[in-house]
Amino acid sequence: MKKALTILFATALFFFASGNLRAQSIISDTICNDGTRIVHVKPEGVCSVNIEIHIRRNRVTFLEYTKGCNGNAKGIAALVEGMKVKEVIRRLEGIQCGKRPTSCPDQLARALKMIYGKKE
């Protein structure tokens, strides 16, 4: 059985590029013995209610959205698997869904920036 170091955060404030104050919450942040970081994020302003992100050696190794557009969520996951975190942010940041100032891909990019800081 793998031991894991779990760090729970109540809420991490995050600002949308549009200037509107929104809260994007990190539900859990776990680092497994093999070095895989597993983060659960509650996105804001989209249909999805949870994003589960696995990162190992600065690459996204698994991605899953809960609720939202099932096919699009699976497509995003298939495309970013194996991609470097920096590249995911570069490609997905700023994508909008209809008239919303954000989207599920944008929420992923914002979550990764929140986790790794603006340097990524």
Please provide the spans of the model-predicted regions:
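Sec/Tat signal peptide C-region and signal peptidase I cleavage site
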Residues: 18-23
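Bacterial N-terminal signal peptides that target proteins for export
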Residues: 1-9, 17
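Active-site- and interface-proximal helix/loop "cap" or "latch" segments in soluble metabolic
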Residues: 35, 42-120
